[in-house]
Amino acid sequence: MALKVLLEQEKTFFTLLVLLGYLSCKVTCESGDCRQQEFRDRSGNCVPCNQCGPGMELSKECGFGYGEDAQCVTCRLHRFKEDWGFQKCKPCLDCAVVNRFQKANCSATSDAICGDCLPGFYRKTKLVGFQDMECVPCGDPPPPYEPHCASKVNLVKIASTASSPRDTALAAVICSALATVLLALLILCVIYCKRQFMEKKPSWSLRSQDIQYNGSELSCFDRPQLHEYAHRACCQCRRDSVQTCGPVRLLPSMCCEEACSPNPATLGCGVHSAASLQARNAGPAGEMVPTFFGSLTQSICGEFSDAWPLMQNPMGGDNISFCDSYPELTGEDIHSLNPELESSTSLDSNSSQDLVGGAVPVQSHSENFTAATDLSRYNNTLVESASTQDALTMRSQLDQESGAVIHPATQTSLQVRQRLGSL
């Protein structure tokens, strides 16, 4: 059984080989018998290809058994054919490419005819004596042996085409937009830089105004820092204290009057500083003084501030006008113009010196408090006697509330002050 199967497979394979050989032989015989310009017709015979006349060519390739249906057609554009034959049409010569004049145009039956070289070009001569078809530029300087390069060519300048109005308008719009954007950016940068500069810049003017107008609000312990300012600034302090300061701000204004006084070193503040309290406590009597008297100073200043509006002169504008009229006067000049002020000051100072050894700090506070009151009453020389009595009554009530004991020497000082008020 196996042998029979192998025999049948061999027969099938051999049959296929014979069939393939026959087909290949048939194809070879059909195409191989015809020559280059021959094609095989329907009967299987090789027939020569058709020849076309001038200006015509076959529509398809013909030869080696192919091109049975090829026909003659006219040459395509820019091509020509001068003779009969099997060849195809050739491309025409372009005289502009070779830099030469064109004498005749190209046609289907003839090629284009080129003339001499264009101005500024010449034809090179080969070694064998023939000239090239293409003309080359003369160059600078031109070769002397070429006649075509001897004369220069007059070139005509062609005017450039003017731009259209639409392009001009578009360019103007673009430039305007760019300029606007740049200007806006510049303005924003300036504003930003100015804000940054103002935020970082210290406000010296505001600080000076705060020192000038708010100086009366400082406590008496801070007044030594303000002695460096001039007499004119002190007058400004007195001028504005009545208008801008409330009842609480009127008590420290004595410090401003102290700066305006003829001799600031001798008068002092109505309430002593911490340094003066320590100096007095160093004496024999200071050893027995309780430590809470330091806080009593602030309470006296606070209680006296409530009563200070009652002691103000309703006609205090005269003193302000005096400062305004003579702002250039120094402390010594004002001292010389007011001899009564010297006597008042000397009386108060003598009375205070007599009480340094034997009086307690509470009595010294009342004494200095009386001296400051006398100074303010002298500056207001037109105070009526009724207002003086009211102020004295108010001061005595304040002293009683604070627990202070009025010393007999203090009463003497009060009598001196009453005499000055009656003047």
Swiss-Prot record:
Q: What is this protein called?
A: Tumor necrosis factor receptor superfamily member 19
In its UniProt record, which GO terms are filed under biological process?
A: apoptotic process; hair follicle development; JNK cascade; positive regulation of canonical NF-kappaB signal transduction; positive regulation of JNK cascade
Which ranges make up the Extracellular topological domains here?
30-170
Residue positions the entry lists as glycosylated:
N105
Is Isomerase included in the keywords of this UniProt record? no
The species this protein belongs to is: Homo sapiens
Disulfide bonds, paired cysteine numbers? C34-C46, C49-C62, C52-C72, C75-C89, C92-C106, C95-C114, C117-C135, C138-C149
Give the location in the cell.
Membrane
Give the matching Gene3D superfamilies.
Tumor Necrosis Factor Receptor, subunit A, domain 2
In terms of one coarse class, where is the protein primarily found?
membrane
Q: Does the keyword Signal apply?
A: yes
What biological function has been recorded for the protein in this entry?
Can mediate activation of JNK and NF-kappa-B. May promote caspase-independent cell death.
**One term under GO cellular component:** plasma membrane
The record's keywords, sorted A to Z, are:
Apoptosis, Disulfide bond, Glycoprotein, Membrane, Receptor, Repeat, Signal, Transmembrane, Transmembrane helix
**In which tissues has expression of this protein been reported?**
Highly expressed in prostate. Detected at lower levels in thymus, spleen, testis, uterus, small intestine, colon and peripheral blood leukocytes.
Q: Which residues lie on this side of the membrane: Cytoplasmic?
A: 192-423
Q: Which residues form the signal peptide?
A: 1-29
Instruction: Point out the gene that encodes the protein.
Output: TNFRSF19
Q: What is the protein's quaternary organization?
A: Associates with TRAF1, TRAF2, TRAF3 and TRAF5. Interacts with LINGO1.
Ranges that cross the membrane = 171-191
- Membrane-topology annotation of the record: Single-pass type I membrane protein
Spans of the TNFR-Cys repeats are: 33-72, 74-114, 116-149
What Gene Ontology terms describe what this protein does at the molecular function level? Answer: signaling receptor activity; tumor necrosis factor receptor activity
